[in-house]
Amino acid sequence: MKTPIRKTHPVMKIANTALVDLPSPSNISTWWNFGSLLGLFLTMQIITGIILAMHYTSEVDMAFDSISHITRNVNYGWLMRTMHMNGAAFMFICMYAHMGRGMYYSSYMLAETWNIGIIIMIATMATAFMGYVLPWGQMSFWGATVITNLVSAIPYIGTDIVYWLWGGFSVGKATLSRFFAFHFVLPFVLIALSGVHLLFLHQTGSNNPLGLNSNLDKIPFHSFFSWKDLLGFAXMILIFCTITLTFPLIMGDPENFNPANPLSTPPHIQPEWYFLFAYAILRSIPNKLGGVVALVGSLIIPATMMLTHKSMLQPMSFRPISQVIFWLFCANFIALSWIGAAPVEDPYITLGQVFSMLYFLFFLTAPMINMLEKKLSLKQ
């Protein structure tokens, strides 16, 4: 029998091993759909972003008007803009769900894949932050000023780095131009990082809900999981289109409808909702350097999870205490996002400090909880 071309062609062979004949555990659930959904939204962001970049002007006097021009005058410009804006939000929803699944089912034990994933998350956050600055509205300008100014907390060289980032002594034309350039380039870096992420994943094979070695029970990715992924695409695109076409601006900030004005500070400066958990942790420390350390720590602390894992079992499916702690962590994550959007006054300051402490305690107490579960299981 003739060998299919997908198995012999030099390029198609790579795609075949990654998407068609990839051996996959037979019992992976819908929670494993979010990886492919992230690929879908990244592709959509790049396509809509390139179209928007054709009409955007990275000049402080024209950036806000060019966004208005895209929305009003360009054919389907309003659709491209709202798709790009809400696509970023949906990408973060999928990313947090993807990471949550990894934490629940102990996918962090695949150390290389997990650590590359954390790098992808930080790079995605940087890309989204720079994109938020581009409309050059009030929240764009002041968000850029406040967040970049945090770098000045670095001893000795911090202030010089901030001026270097800004391209001057304040956020201005040079800042906008370089942020536009980086925002355009970084998604392609994300594609490369995603390729490395998949490369490491395919070296070890996917994790599964039981946390056991599934080499004896593997099935081809196509057609079993390709159809399953398509169902996930259909469901997520339906929700995405409903929001984009019905409530297109629900995830934006009303303050950003005002052009950037360096002489007028908004009453409450806040980033997009998907950064609010980290912003709340930053604000919970009264010291500037301490806040920056806590912010960076909140993003990189998941990298320690494979070091603190002391359980005999991998997934939390069979660890009831860890399950309770994990879902409390999820609730805490949502609470931190709420606090990040609240004004800096009591009781929000105190609540932010409590929730920030609980966020870090989830990671720090993991080995003790694992050992407690081990003792309880051995007693039985």
Curated annotation (Swiss-Prot):
One GO cellular component term noted in the UniProt record for this chain: respiratory chain complex III
PROSITE patterns in UniProt: CYTB_CTER (PS51003), CYTB_NTER (PS51002)
CDD domains, per the entry: cytochrome_b_C, Cytochrome_b_N
Gene3D superfamilies xrefs: Cytochrome Bc1 Complex, Chain C
Domain of life: Eukaryota
Summary of subunit composition and partner proteins: The main subunits of complex b-c1 are: cytochrome b, cytochrome c1 and the Rieske protein.
Alphabetical list of PANTHER family matching this protein: CYTOCHROME B
The protein, known as: Cytochrome b
